[in-house]
Amino acid sequence: MKAAIIGAMEEEVAILRSRMEEREEVVIAGCEFSTGRLDGVEAVLLKSGIGKVNAAMGTTLLLDRFRPDFVINTGSAGGFLPSLRVGDLVISDEVVHHDVDVTAFGYAYGQVPGLPARYRADEALVEAAKQAAAQLDGLQAAIGLIATGDSFMNDPKRVEFVRGQFPELCAVEMEAAAIAQVCVQFGTPFVIIRALSDIAGEESNVSFEQFLETAAKHSAELVLSMLTVVQSKAKQ
C-alpha cells in the first residue's frame, strides 16, 4: 500500500516531512516530492505550490511517476459552516470548482465541460478520515462539500455569491478541486481533509499566519491518525 499526501505550502507539509523515515527527496518542475515511510506506511509527500494550476501539475506528476494507491490532500481552508471554528476539520464527500462558469452552454455552475459537476471522494477514505477524526480530542469534524477557486475569499460579496451557489458548502480553499479532477481522470481514489485557518467573511484580531500554524498542525494530526486507520483496515 502506497499513500500520497499533497499540501500546497511548507506549513502544510513540514510536520509530515519531519515524521517521514527513510526519506528521499526530489524536485520535478518546481514540485517538491519526499518519499519514505510515515508511521510504517509507504508514502510520497508532495508540496505542490498554491493554486489550481500548481496543484493539477503536481498531482499529475505524482500519479504518473509514483503510482500511489490513494491520495490525501491536506492543509488549511476557510470555513463556511456556522458551527465550525478555526482549527476544526472538514472532510470532503464532494469537491467542486467555485470559479468555473460555463452555464451559458447548459452546464452546472462549477462544472468543467466533459467532467462531473462535482468530484466524489472515495467512500472508504472518507470513512477512514471520519474514524481518525473521532480519535482527536477537542476538535469538531464535518463531512461535506469543499469548493475551490484561485482567490482568497475575503470579499463579502464573493462569499455571499459562492454561498448562494452552494448553500451546503463547508469550506473553501485553492487546490482541492484541481487535485480531485486529476485523480478522477486517473481513476485514483482521493479524499480532501482540511483544518480551518479562518472563517469566510469574518474578521479576527489573530493573524492568518497564527491560524495557519494551528490549522496545519491539526490537519497533519488527522493525516497521521488516518494512515493508522487505513493500515489497520488493510491488515484485516
UniProtKB/Swiss-Prot annotation:
Reaction(s) this enzyme catalyzes, per UniProt: S-adenosyl-L-homocysteine + H2O = S-(5-deoxy-D-ribos-5-yl)-L-homocysteine + adenine; S-methyl-5'-thioadenosine + H2O = 5-(methylsulfanyl)-D-ribose + adenine; 5'-deoxyadenosine + H2O = 5-deoxy-D-ribose + adenine
UniProt-listed Pfam families: PNP_UDP_1
Keyword Repeat attached: no
Pathway the protein contributes to: Amino-acid biosynthesis; L-methionine biosynthesis via salvage pathway; S-methyl-5-thio-alpha-D-ribose 1-phosphate from S-methyl-5'-thioadenosine (hydrolase route): step 1/2
Swiss-Prot/TrEMBL GO biological process terms: L-methionine salvage from methylthioadenosine; L-methionine salvage from S-adenosylmethionine; nucleoside catabolic process
Top-level taxon in the UniProt lineage: Bacteria
Catalytic residues identified in the record: E12 (proton acceptor), D198 (proton donor)
EC top class, as a word: hydrolase
Coiled-coil regions listed: none
Keywords: Amino-acid biosynthesis, Hydrolase, Methionine biosynthesis
Molecular function terms, GO-annotated: adenosylhomocysteine nucleosidase activity; methylthioadenosine nucleosidase activity
E.C. code: 3.2.2.9
A GO CC annotation given for this chain: cytosol
NCBIfam families: MTA_SAH-Nsdase, PRK05584.1
Similarity-based family: Belongs to the PNP/UDP phosphorylase family. MtnN subfamily.
Annotated function: Catalyzes the irreversible cleavage of the glycosidic bond in both 5'-methylthioadenosine (MTA) and S-adenosylhomocysteine (SAH/AdoHcy) to adenine and the corresponding thioribose, 5'-methylthioribose and S-ribosylhomocysteine, respectively. Also cleaves 5'-deoxyadenosine, a toxic by-product of radical S-adenosylmethionine (SAM) enzymes, into 5-deoxyribose and adenine.
Protein name per its UniProtKB record: 5'-methylthioadenosine/S-adenosylhomocysteine nucleosidase
Species of the source: Geobacillus thermodenitrificans (strain NG80-2)
